[in-house]
Amino acid sequence: MSGMPKSSKMLQYINYRMRVTIQDGRVIVGRFLAFDKHMNVVICDAEEFRRIRQKGKEDREEKRTLGMILIRGETVVSMSVEAPPPEEAKLAATSKMPPQIPGGPGIGRAVGRGMPMGGMGMGGSGPMSGLTGPVRGVGGPAPHSMMPGGGVPPPMGRGGFPPQGFPPGGPSPQGAFNNNPNNNNGGPPQGFPPGGPIGRGGFPPQGFPPGGPMGGPNLNNGNMPPQGFPPGGPMGRGGFPPQGFPPGGPNFNNMPPQGFPPGGPMGRGGFQRK
């Protein structure tokens, strides 16, 4: 409708059902949508009616559905009103706002990822609205992964931190004795020194030599004596003799000890002194 004055009489027939007759005798009936100064016409829901003449018979009319078509103004012979516009077309023409579609159960909201209108210089107790992260369930990880404490803590004694209320270091070494039924972490009960009972592989309390008390079992395979004893252990067990004693322990190979002539005492089967 470009170039047409607003006071044109053709404007009042918009959305009417019109009958357009063209030069070849066909009649187009449809809803009148638009026109221009050249009288080019746009028709929707168009139906074509053609009259066919037969010799010796009456003329018959043939109908064909076309849909939306554009009719050139140079072929238009006449136009007439066929029917008034439908009810929905009247409501759309009279109302200023288009008919609104009723909303569903959900509510669409914009995801806040931009900076707030007040800028970064605005003071406030909480974080700015543009820096709060994505809305839960939209553009981010799953909600359960954002909750604190979601991971499984590492087991005690393997490099992880102990739970709250437990001493650091995890359970005591293997072999420590636990006679406290309420103590389930393998450590010594309250009131006992660390390392478990004496002589079971733990560290001795302060003031005692390592390896257990005197007379207790030596757990180092007899190689090193406890603190305060000469090296070598008891004589005759394969260790080094104390200072002032010959090495080797008792003589079992018919050799006299150091400082005695070879052969041993006379009269016992040894070698006699020359």
From Swiss-Prot:
Residue stretches of each Sequence repeat: 162-171, 188-197, 204-213, 225-234, 241-250, 256-265
GO cellular component, one term: U2-type prespliceosome
GO molecular function: RNA binding; snRNP binding
Alphabetical GO biological process terms: mRNA splicing, via spliceosome
Sm domain span: 5-85
Keyword Acyltransferase assigned: no
Family: Belongs to the snRNP SmB/SmN family.
Keyword Transmembrane helix: no
Protein task: Plays a role in pre-mRNA splicing as a core component of the spliceosomal U1, U2, U4 and U5 small nuclear ribonucleoproteins (snRNPs), the building blocks of the spliceosome.
Record localization: Cytoplasm, Cytosol; Nucleus
Ranges of compositional bias, category Low complexity: 173-187, 216-226
Source organism (scientific name): Dictyostelium discoideum
Keywords: Cytoplasm, mRNA processing, mRNA splicing, Nucleus, Repeat, Ribonucleoprotein, RNA-binding, Spliceosome
Name assigned to this protein: Small nuclear ribonucleoprotein-associated protein B
InterPro entries from the UniProt entry: LSM_dom_sf, Sm, Sm_dom_euk/arc, snRNP_SmB/NAA38-like
Chief location category: cytoplasm
Pfam families: LSM
Domain of life of the native organism: Eukaryota
